[in-house]
Regions:
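Helix-to-loop junctions at the C-terminal end of transmembrane segments
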Residues: 2-13
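MFS 12-TM fold signature
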Residues: 22-32, 82, 147-151
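C-terminal ends and interior cores of transmembrane alpha-helices
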Residues: 23-68
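Small-residue-rich segments within alpha-helical transmembrane domains of MFS-like 12-TM solute carriers
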Residues: 67, 83-91, 122, 219
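Cytoplasmic helix-loop-helix junction between adjacent transmembrane helices
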Residues: 78-117
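Helix-loop-helix hairpin linking two adjacent transmembrane segments in secondary transporters
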Residues: 118-166
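Juxtamembrane intracellular "pre-TM" segments in multi-pass secondary transporters
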Residues: 163-211
Length: 222
């Protein structure tokens, strides 16, 4: 999914690509909260109930297997929507880093935003149980999803390309673009040409399988 999400971000441009990614992710997060209501609506036809009402309706249904199957299917769908948005987040972040940092600073800047996921993983066991206990488990999904929409607002008004950003000075722009300036001044500079590798050819390398195995073993927990 990262492969196609990266191409999608390139096609849309960084700002729009990240907006789509965080928007879809936020919708997916909020959808989890409504799985109970959707389950009661699909099985009983009663859609106009709140979170508490859906719990009561589901608890009175005798066919437990049907309830479980529908609920699990809805959660899988919500997780799929969440994953589509999540897949676009990392390519957009890398693209933003490439736009705002010269090559020598990109590794450090990438480590900063990548550490955000670790901070979130540490904060989740503290905050999510408190929200779920105080307001119900549904609100833990809605609040987290709503924070994504809040971040979208900051992104719309605060981000722009360095050459168009009003708060980027000429000195800062020159620092950001130092690699382009240095390359253009090289005598006999020849742009690097690379050949494209097809998606299928990637599976011919043992490094691909090693990476895939590592992701398979860790991403389920992560």
């Amino acid at each position: 999914s990262l492969l196609f999400a990266g191409r999608f971000v390139d096609w849309l441009d960084t700002k729009k690509g990240f907006l789509w990614a965080i928007g879809i992710w936020s919708v997916g997060a909020c959808l989890h909260a409504f799985c109970g209501i959707a389950t009661s609506g699909i099985i009983t036809g009663n859609w106009f109930v709140g979170f508490h009402g859906s719990k009561e309706i589901i608890s009175t249904i005798n066919d437990t297997a049907l309830v479980i199957n529908v609920s699990v299917a809805l959660f899988i769908f919500a997780r799929f929507v969440l994953a589509v948005g999540e897949a676009g987040n990392f390519p957009a972040a890398i693209k933003t880093t490439a736009e705002y940092f010269p090559k020598k600073d990109r590794a450090f800047s990438t480590s900063i935003f990548n550490a955000g996921a670790t901070v979130g993983a540490l904060a989740a066991p503290i905050t999510i149980p408190f929200i779920a206990k105080s307001f119900g488990w549904e609100m833990s999904f809605i609040i987290i999803g709503a924070l994504g929409f809040v971040w979208m607002g900051f992104w719309v008004f605060m981000y722009d390309k360095p050459e168009r950003h009003p708060r980027v000075s000429a000195e800062e722009l020159a620092y950001i673009q130092q690699d382009d300036i240095a390359d253009s001044k090289l005598e006999g500079y020849v742009p690097e040409t690379t050949s494209k590798v097809s998606f299928v050819d990637c599976f011919k390398y043992k490094q691909t399988w090693a990476f895939a195995f590592g992701k398979f073993m860790t991403d389920g927990v992560w």
